[in-house]
Amino acid sequence: MATLLCDLQERSAKVERARHWDSKQGSSNSDVASGGSEVAGNSGNNSYLGDDVGWKIYPYRFLQLLQHLEQLQFTIQAPRHARLGISTVRMWSLRPYYNYDSYLEKDLIQPDVPHDSLIWALLRYVGRAVDRWVSRTFQPPRIRPLHANDPPAEASL
């Protein structure tokens, strides 16, 4: 990750030097913005950042994304056949860059293998039953509203 970050910083420095050189020559980078040959990445040594279009146009965005990803702690997803729970995929910290909800709907809740869907249905059923039992068993005591004919609290002591 660190070498990739250094490589990106070096490439973005090349972009700035090339832009400075272009401004000295009196040309603008309109061909980059309008989709010229340099955007396609086939202009040889004249291309700023190689073949990747995104690095050419927005190098600082990729640097920001890499620096952010470097600070995150997340678990890589398990193989499809080994997934038994949502805890195997922890992508909440990537939420700005990754649509977690659609991932759950498409990939985890509706697996490809039929027996996996049976396991998921069983897990959901057991989870709901446990939730109902816990909510019934450990309910906080209900506080009765005071009525006019109730004795004052001091009298009960």
Curated annotation (Swiss-Prot):
Q: In which pathway does it act?
A: Mycotoxin biosynthesis
Please indicate if the UniProt record lists Chloroplast as a keyword: no
Q: Which UniProt keywords apply?
A: Virulence
Q: Would you say which domain of life the source belongs to?
A: Eukaryota
Q: What induces it?
A: Expression is up-regulated more than 10 fold in toxin producing cultures.
The segment annotated Disordered runs over 17-43
Q: Please give the function described in this protein's UniProt entry.
A: Part of the gene clusters that mediate the biosynthesis of AM-toxins, host-selective toxins (HSTs) causing Alternaria blotch on apple, a worldwide distributed disease. AM-toxins are cyclic depsipeptides containing the 3 residues 2-hydroxy-isovaleric acid (2-HIV), dehydroalanine, L-alanine which are common for all 3 AM-toxins I to III. The fourth precursor is L-alpha-amino-methoxyphenyl-valeric acid (L-Amv) for AM-toxin I, L-alpha-amino-phenyl-valeric acid (L-Apv) for AM-toxin II, and L-alpha-amino-hydroxyphenyl-valeric acid (L-Ahv) for AM-toxin III.
User: Other notes on this protein?
Assistant: Gene clusters encoding host-selective toxins (HSTs) are localized on conditionally dispensable chromosomes (CDCs), also called supernumerary chromosomes, where they are present in multiple copies. The CDCs are not essential for saprophytic growth but controls host-selective pathogenicity.
Q: What is this protein called?
A: AM-toxin biosynthesis protein 15
Q: Which organism is it from?
A: Alternaria alternata (Alternaria rot fungus)
Q: Which gene encodes it?
A: AMT15
